[in-house]
């Protein structure tokens, strides 16, 4: 079975210091890139043990997933009108929500911004965050597909297959929302891409699973929850647990 040797922080980050400001501020050099290849170091495993239910907890999750399917195109109310300026304009000159450190430096371009500039920044910032959610969900889609290939138990393969479909819906919903309601999209952040690459590149299925659940889904859930609290968009704040789920 293929194995991956642990890498140093310098190798993972591709820089000598974790505090390298220029590297931290890196941007995507090719925003028009359509395809991005990552080496998958893992072996695809067949199992000839088809004993369904040998792992009851996974079997229970699999059965639950089969009856909880939904359609991103028809189960959400896409007729709801969204005004990005009203729904997501939380950074304003008067509210000063989280903007103090951006305006204190004398050379900051935001120092003399008024509400017009903060409104535009809010929309762009929200579009950037939604775009990163979408890219992260595609990362989770690839991770779950890899888990189907690499996990050794049939119950785990069954359940992971339902997660592949679920992550595909998440990507679909975010893209539809961005395309139809916001109209502004951003390429993947290079640091998020680095994280996704490293998770997918690892040969160990359990590390792929942990990386997906803790680093990708966990961070996304926290950020998504914060955005859920500050927006007034009815589609975005729908109470259904299936709506725009991460």
What residues fall within each predicted segment?
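Short, contiguous, pocket-lining structural segments
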Residues: 132, 136, 140, 152, ...
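Conserved small/polar residues in nucleotide/adenosyl-binding loops
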Residues: 236-243
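Terminal targeting/low-complexity segments that flank the catalytic cores of oxidoreductases
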Residues: 1-145, 149-157, 180-187, 203, ...
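Acidic interhelical loop/turn segments
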Residues: 228-235
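Carboxylate/His-rich catalytic cores and anion/metal-binding grooves
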Residues: 153, 158-183
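A structural feature that tracks compact, well-ordered secondary-structure segments
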Residues: 144-145, 161, 221-226
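Active-site-adjacent scaffolding segments
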Residues: 171-228
């Amino acid at each position: 079975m293929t194995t991956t040797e642990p890498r140093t922080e310098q190798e993972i980050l591709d820089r000598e210091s974790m505090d390298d400001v220029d590297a931290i501020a890196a941007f995507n050099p090719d925003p028009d890139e359509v395809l991005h290849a990552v080496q998958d170091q893992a072996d695809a495993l067949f199992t000839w043990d088809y004993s369904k239910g040998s792992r009851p907890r996974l079997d229970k999750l699999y059965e639950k997933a089969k009856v909880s399917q939904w359609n991103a195109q028809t189960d959400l109310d896409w007729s709801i009108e969204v005004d990005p300026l009203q729904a997501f304009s939380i950074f304003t000159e008067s509210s000063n929500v989280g903007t103090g450190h951006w305006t204190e430096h004398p050379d900051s371009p935001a120092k003399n911004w008024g509400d017009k500039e903060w409104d535009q920044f809010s929309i762009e910032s929200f579009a950037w965050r939604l775009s990163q959610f979408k890219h992260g969900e595609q990362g989770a889609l690839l991770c779950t597909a890899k888990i189907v290939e690499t996990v050794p138990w049939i119950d785990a393969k069954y359940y992971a297959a339902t997660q592949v479909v679920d992550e595909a819906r998440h990507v679909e919903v975010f893209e539809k929302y961005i395309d139809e309601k916001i109209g502004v999209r951003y390429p993947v952040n290079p640091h998020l891409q680095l994280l996704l690459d490293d998770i997918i590149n690892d040969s160990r299925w359990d590390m792929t699973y942990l990386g997906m659940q803790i680093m990708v889904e966990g961070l996304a859930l926290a950020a998504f929850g914060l955005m859920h609290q500050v927006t007034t968009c009815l589609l975005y704040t729908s109470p259904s647990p299936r709506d725009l789920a991460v």
